[in-house]
């Protein structure tokens, strides 16, 4: 039950610490690297962690007297003790460990020497702190059952057309999502580990150039990613081919479409190593134009939906059954899902979830736990969606961000942002309620792309104004 805090870039010692903690029967507390120093200190203290494992650079932003309950701090570079409260015991232990190991196992350590404690399914083994938008993040209590159910689902899921498992022994994964995030940990680490897959950890920020170079070397058989990865490839590599040059002309000839799509598909597959069986996309909504094009060229993509509170998976569909605009079917047999709406197929309502994946609650936070977990065990996700009779979910937006227009219509900012983000030189956008039934959009231009195309920064305001006019025309239509 002791808590062990863990923060650092993806590397083998991060994984060893994680597995060593939960198989020992303690509770792992992974912390996202991009949290502020204040958030990191809060999580360490709030979780009551006794030990801390971290990348050396993080120790520079933490003062010893800010984490008084921590008894020792270890480096994820080589596991040496950076700090110990009494200044003696750990240093002696580390010095004697090799001698003690040889004494206890004179013939060497074998599989028969491995013993794990009996850990009940409902025991908390993971405290995953969410990246909250207001105030401090909440510690999601996840149990053995929550993690095991997610991993076993992933390990046994197949392409129903080929009968082949997505995660398989000898399969190759390039792990570049942050492992401290529930999505990355479950499907870039635990699932491939459980089936005997080969995991390559990318210990760098996954910039496009670094990522594609790594793909060429690793040649992954499965890729778990966020939408932005594929959206950037579509915008910066595919769109220019379709809008300029020979392909743009050939695209106007119907008989050549399928041949061009095959060429583009092969180029994209080769860029990702050439051996990918499926791209599992999650973590955020995907741009509809990008998704539509990838499906048109028969790119092996599926989009899932989940949240930290479900460790994380709620819905998933094999790529050969995936429906456009959806985020897959909810996991029948593991979860119950219902839409809080009088007409769930047509009118969006809040997604409610109950079952094997649902968290135990928020650590030391009964107030927020009761806000999202009702007496019948339903988790109120805050996400608005419609649902097909077969359980396929179509997310419209967040209940907290929904805007009521002047004519009484429900407006989901995410749907407008989706259109805006696909416009010329738009990198990101945020749609807000401006009051009086009106909305406004904040836009971040793609300065990198503008520079590459020789566009003067002074021209960007007019370009964004043109985008606004085009957006209004689309919304009016």
What are the functions of these language-model segments?
Residues 125-152:
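Conserved AMP-binding A3 loop
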Residues 23-102, 437, 466:
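Structural core segment of the AMP-binding/adenylate-forming
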Residues 98-129, 136, 162-172:
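Conserved pre-ATP/AMP-binding loop-to-beta segment of ANL
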Residues 1-35, 176:
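Conserved AMP-binding/adenylate-forming
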Residues 35, 52-54, 355, 360-361, ...:
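AMP-binding/adenylate-forming catalytic core of the ANL superfamily
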Residues 200-202, 279, 286-349, 357-360, ...:
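Conserved ATP-binding loop and adjacent catalytic segment of the adenylate-forming AMP-binding
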Residues 7, 338, 345-405:
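Conserved ATP-binding/catalytic segment of the ANL
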Residues 148-172, 179-266, 275, 300:
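Conserved AMP-binding/adenylation subdomain of ANL enzymes
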């Amino acid at each position: 039950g002791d808590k062990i805090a863990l923060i650092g870039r993806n590397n083998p010692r991060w994984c060893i610490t994680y597995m060593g903690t939960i198989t020992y029967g303690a509770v792992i507390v992974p912390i996202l690297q991009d949290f502020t120093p204040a958030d990191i200190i809060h999580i360490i203290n709030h979780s009551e962690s006794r030990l801390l494992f971290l990348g050396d650079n993080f120790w520079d932003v933490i003062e010893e007297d800010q984490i008084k309950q921590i008894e020792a701090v270890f480096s994820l570079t080589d596991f040496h003790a950076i700090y110990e409260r009494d200044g003696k015991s750990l240093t002696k232990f580390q010095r004697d460990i090799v001698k003690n190991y040889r004494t206890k196992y004179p013939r060497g350590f074998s599989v028969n020497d491995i013993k794990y404690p009996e850990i009940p399914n409902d025991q908390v083994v993971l405290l995953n702190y969410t990246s909250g938008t207001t105030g401090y993040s909440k510690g999601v209590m996840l149990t053995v059952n929550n993690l095991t159910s997610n991993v076993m689902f992933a390990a046994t899921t197949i392409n129903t057309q080929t009968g082949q498992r997505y995660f398989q022994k000898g399969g190759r994964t390039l792990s570049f999502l942050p492992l401290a995030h529930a999505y990355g940990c479950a499907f870039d680490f635990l699932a491939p580990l459980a089936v005997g897959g080969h995991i390559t950890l990318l210990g760098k920020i996954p910039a496009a150039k670094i990522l594609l170079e790594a793909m060429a070397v690793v040649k992954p058989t499965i890729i778990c990613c966020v939408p932005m990865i594929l959206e950037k490839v579509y915008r910066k590599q595919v769109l220019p081919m379709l809008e300029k040059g020979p392909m743009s002309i050939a695209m106007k000839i119907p008989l050549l479409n399928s041949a061009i799509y095959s060429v583009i598909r092969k180029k994209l597959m080769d860029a990702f190593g050439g051996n990918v069986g499926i791209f599992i996309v999650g973590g955020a909504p995907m741009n509809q134009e990008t998704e539509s094009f990838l499906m048109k060229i028969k790119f092996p993509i599926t989009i899932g939906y989940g949240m930290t509170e479900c460790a994380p998976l709620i819905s998933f569909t094999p790529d050969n059954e995936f429906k456009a605009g959806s985020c897959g079917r909810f996991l029948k047999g593991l979860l119950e899902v219902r839409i809080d709406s009088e007409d769930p197929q047509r009118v969006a309502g809040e997604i409610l979830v109950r079952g094997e994946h649902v968290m135990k609650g928020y650590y030391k936070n009964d107030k927020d736990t009761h806000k999202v977990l009702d007496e019948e065990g339903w988790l109120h996700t805050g996400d608005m969606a419609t649902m097909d009779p077969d359980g396929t979910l179509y997310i419209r937006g967040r209940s907290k961000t929904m805007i009521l227009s002047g004519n009484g219509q429900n407006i989901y900012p995410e749907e407008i942002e989706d259109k805006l983000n696909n416009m010329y030189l738009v990198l990101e956008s945020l749609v807000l309620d401006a009051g009086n039934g009106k909305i406004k959009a904040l836009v971040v231009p793609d300065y990198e792309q503008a520079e590459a195309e020789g566009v003067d920064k002074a021209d960007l305001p007019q370009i964004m104004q043109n985008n606004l006019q085009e957006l209004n025309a689309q919304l009016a239509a």
